[in-house]
Amino acid sequence: MIDTLERLRTDVDLWVASASEDGHAYLVPLSYHWDGAALLVATPRASRTARNLIRTGWARVALGPTRDVVIVEGPVDAIPIGADPELEDAHALAAGFDPRTLSEEYVYLRIRPHEIQAWREANELEGRSVMRGGAWLE
């Protein structure tokens, strides 16, 4: 669990998986901010990622390399630009860019972990669940 929290705190980018209504998979890298309780990403409001995640209200994301991966799954809330300046400032600092300065309309997507799995090698597969039902496991 400590390694997982460290990765959430220190990584900058993650992969976001989503699917269209007709089942076409879509995968995109996004920068994020971890506030200790949720992941915050920003993407163009008209993007497939935003449309898919807002429609389903659920996300599955991956952080880290394949041999030290963290998989996070949970509900998504859309936050319009300007709704929470403090959170938006934190995202800009962590992500290295500020979507509020861009001409294209962006939306923030808050992903609240419901389940987290983490593992490095096959010997860690059995104990890979570190969060279930929104509660950290020992």
Question: Which residue ranges define each predicted feature?
Answer:
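A generic local structural motif
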Residues: 1-3, 27-28, 46, 96
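Short, basic/aromatic recognition patches
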Residues: 1-15
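Hydrophobic alpha-helical segments typical of transmembrane helices
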Residues: 3-4, 49, 87
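Generic marker of residues within folded, mature protein domains
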Residues: 6, 22, 51, 64-66, ...
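Alpha-helix boundary recognition
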Residues: 6-9, 54-55, 92
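Short beta-strand segments
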Residues: 11-45, 51-53, 59-63, 71-73
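A short local loop/turn or secondary-structure capping micro-motif enriched for an aromatic residue
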Residues: 35-36, 48-51, 79-80, 126-128
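Charged, gly/pro-rich active-site loop segments
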Residues: 68-138
